[in-house]
Amino acid sequence: MSHPEPEVRLAGVFLSVYSTSVTRTISGSILQALKRNLSHLHTDTDANFRREIHGYTQKLFDRLRASTATLAKSKSKSSASERARLAFPKPTPGLESSLSKRSPRDSLLESLSFVFWYIRFLEWELRPTASYQSRITALRCLIIVLRSGVDPGVPFASLSKSAQGQLNWAHGLQIGSIKLIRSLLDLILDPYDDVRDAAVSVLQLCLVALPQPDRKRVMSTFPHFIARAEAAMLRTGRADQADGVARAYGMLFTLASHGPEEPTDSQFASKLSLFEHLQTQLKDTLQVTHNDLSRAVDGQPVHGTFAALRYVVDQSDFYALIAGAPQEMFTRWKQLHGDIVTSIESLWSCVYHVLCADAPEGHVPDELEDEISLDTKEILSYSWRGLKEARYATLNFCRT
């Protein structure tokens, strides 16, 4: 696995994780070899190489799930029908060295200790100073680990096909932690699109798997995160940060409750209140655009809000949710939906005189010519970004 040739490294990983019998125990020496080599395997610059590593990680956890379940069943005297998960052994200083000195080796404890180590290793790979390859590989491997079923809180429908079979984990480990969730929130604003997408997927699985009290506690921190992310988006106007904020809103909409919000709840407590918040934000931003285009270009980008609405409306159950709502809520949904369609027309009325001028570089209105901080490129960028996201939102509205 440390050979200079990538084909040999991949062959080494394959031979380490593959077996004709999925319940066959992985030896402690192989697990130690994986620990020594996973760091450089995850950071390979070849995307195809990393894709192969993802496939082998899937095979590794399929085998760990089956082998540990078989070992636990042989050690346990409880009935086979008992479904309560056993706790993972808590790591202690010197555990690894003590395992290597035991005779005979405790294969179950070695395998469970490796799973615990691997999750902590993936968390470390998400650090801000890590390379792009480390971050994206760790995120995709975390998805594999979560979908393997080792966290008992992950819904059955979200598990991989192999994890939905007969051989289930005998032990359970809660993967979502404050440290991991904080790292994932930071990665939602990552410059790379695939990192942002994977971070949202991992975070959503982690939040769904958390016990209800823990989930509520974590969700209570989201308004502060959204406010911080929106402030950065407004300050820079960068498309990647706007997309990160939009993805965060889409995830919050998925996790929000279906019912009407209580007076004490935040604006993100229910799907309707969150959608209403986005519509109000869009309306206020467009009002600024109507009144002072230079101010809007300089610090009130509209494309982030349209992108957030696109991620919300693009969810498969969005219109089914509206159709099944009580009459009073249905009326509010319908009104908000119509207001957003009107806002798309409003954006066009604000920028068409810039984009439709008979000039290749666009037309700068007279009132903006004296703005030293603005040029034609910035005005065109503001206009086209907003219209691009508004177009995607319109396509989602019309498609359904």
Language-model features, listed with the residues they occupy:
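Alpha-solenoid helical repeat scaffolds
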Residues: M1-A33, N37-T285, A308, S316, ...
